[in-house]
A protein has these predicted regions:
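A post-motif C-terminal structural segment
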Residues: 31-33, 42-47, 52-94, 144-145, ...
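Bacterial Sec-dependent N-terminal signal peptides
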Residues: 1-25
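Active-site-adjacent structural elements in enzyme catalytic domains
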Residues: 29-36, 41, 45-46, 51, ...
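Short glycine-rich loop/turn motifs that provide flexible caps or phosphate-binding loops at active sites
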Residues: 38-42, 98, 131, 437
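Extracytoplasmic mature domains of secreted/periplasmic and thylakoid-lumen proteins
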Residues: 93-169, 176
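Short, motif-level signal for alpha-helix interfacial/capping segments enriched in acidic residues
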Residues: 18-21, 25-26, 291-294, 298
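Residue-level recognition of conserved structural "scaffold" positions that shape functional pockets
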Residues: 13, 46-50, 100, 106, ...
Length: 473
């Protein structure tokens, strides 16, 4: 009995001795480098559909995993706002940034509009971390704004921009600013200059200026659309990409690694494509988004014990459905779409202008064949061709065109109908041009990833990130 007691004592002492260093090691691990990726409008079906689309393109049934869907933690998240079952990007952005529910349309203020609520980006700054905010929309758009601004209405874009230097973060990037001036007010670029920000326009300009800049705002070149970068499907050589912005953020924020960094990177064009019910543009945005995420994964491989990567979405857009009744999909048909619906619309408008309405049906068929693969790559039902011919007759009569409006676009009816038909051929459908209350996905890799298991609300995510960032100094 004494021998047994003695043996148990030795085992107990050994367990205690070995347990202490392990616990200490766990306590030492903090999220020194935090990547927070938000796919605006990227619901579960947007992700699953992209993977199935990639699989079909490779000649198989099933999924071709995206890099972030292989992360060890895969979860789903609720998105309702303070007063609505269906959120807007401002309220969802506030929840993801601050951990607080608010009223739809509100940028990082409480639901009564009485006080500001502060983002984990602000808290990271207080911890001495470098901070970056990036998007492929305008920098004053709802999601990025929720991390640095406090305004009662997301449409107050000038006021949102004036909050940027007040936050004092190190790196901002995106298309630009949609309202740099306001009557009887100071131009926002003057405010940025006074606050010590370097303005870089285009990737080459950024590379020239970044090394010497203390704080920087990285935008598209002069003359480009300040509302958004081009869709991935429309991108031309020399166009700025979210991947380049992401690499720029990593390089700039890594100049001083003493206290680490926090960076939020939004792919806002997933949402825009979904508002337009443009499946091919949306799939291409998700595929392009993973290129940005790969930059973070590459960084993680160099700092595996100090890096946290979180990928999620603010809400689902479009009530996107995979399947239209028949038990099959034909997603590979979407690979024949060469441009976004918006660019197709511009091509149709240009055809009308250059030909002064003297456009033949054969001219239109060639345009739709070249850009969507209709007739040449995908056979058309008689009813589909009839619909297109009807739209052609209206589009090229001398009557006034009534454009098809979505939240961020106005498109030619012929372009809208043609893309709808290609979607039907692919056997996917859209329930609306707005948001839905559907779950959004969550994928996590790195330090503390296990803390994101279990059903979560969007407000849980920033709270957990903050907990993992604490005490890194």
């Amino acid at each position: 009995m004494k021998k047994l007691f003695g043996l148990l004592s030795v085992v107990l002492v050994a367990v205690i001795c070995f347990a202490q260093p392990v616990d200490a090691a766990k306590k030492e691990k903090r999220a020194k480098y935090v990547f927070y990726f938000i796919g605006d409008g990227m619901g579960i079906n947007q992700v699953n559909g992209t993977e199935m689309y990639l699989a079909e393109r490779a000649g198989k049934i099933g999924v071709e995993p995206l890099n972030f869907t292989t992360f060890p933690v895969r979860n789903f998240v609720t998105t309702y706002s303070a007063y609505n079952s269906v959120t807007c990007s401002a309220a969802a952005g506030t929840a993801l940034a601050t951990g607080e529910k608010t009223k739809n349309g509100t940028i990082a203020m409480d639901k009564e509009h009485k006080a500001p609520v502060y983002s984990i980006a602000t808290k990271a700054k207080e911890l001495g971390m470098k901070v970056g905010i990036a998007t492929n929309n305008s920098i004053d758009h709802a999601t990025p704004a929720c991390f640095y601004a406090h305004q009662p209405d997301r449409n107050m874009t000038y006021e949102i921009a004036t909050d940027l230097p007040k936050a004092g973060f190190d790196f901002y990037a995106g298309a630009g600013f949609v309202k740099p001036e306001k009557k009887d007010s100071v131009n926002i670029y003057t405010l940025f200059d006074r606050a010590g920000y370097t303005i870089a326009r285009g990737n080459d300009d950024f590379r020239k200026k970044a090394a010497k800049a203390d704080k920087i705002i990285f935008m598209q070149e002069q003359g480009c659309d300040m509302g958004s970068l081009p869709y991935a499907i429309d991108r031309k050589p020399g166009d700025l990409s979210l991947e380049e912005i992401t690499q720029g953020a990593i390089d700039f924020l890594s100049k001083d690694k003493k206290n680490g960094f926090f960076v939020m990177i939004e792919c806002g064009l997933i949402d825009w494509a979904c508002h337009s019910n443009d499946a091919a543009a949306m799939f291409n945005e998700v595929i392009d988004f993973q290129k940005s995420i790969q930059k973070a994964i590459d960084f993680y491989k160099q700092h595996p014990d100090e890096t946290l990567i979180v990928v999620t979405a603010d809400h689902e857009t479009g009530n996107f459905a995979l399947g239209t009744g028949k038990y099959e999909l034909n997603l590979k048909a979407l690979q024949h779409q060469m441009v976004s619906k918006g660019q197709l619309s511009k091509k149709i408008s240009a055809l009308r202008t250059t030909h002064h309405y003297a456009v033949t049906w054969e001219d239109v068929k060639k345009l739709l064949s070249d850009n969507l693969g209709l007739w040449t790559k995908e056979e058309l039902k008689e009813s589909y061709e009839k619909d297109l011919r009807h739209r052609y007759d209206k589009a090229f009569s001398n009557g006034e065109q009534e454009m098809v409006k979505s939240l961020y676009a106005e498109d030619e009816p012929l372009a809208n109908t043609a893309v709808q038909i290609l979607n039907r051929i692919a056997r996917i459908s859209w329930g609306s041009g707005g948001h839905s209350a559907g779950y959004v996905p969550l994928f996590v890799l790195g330090v503390g990833a296990e803390n994101f298991n279990g059903k979560l609300d969007n407000t849980d995510i920033p709270r957990q990130i903050e907990a993992l960032m604490r005490d890194i100094q």
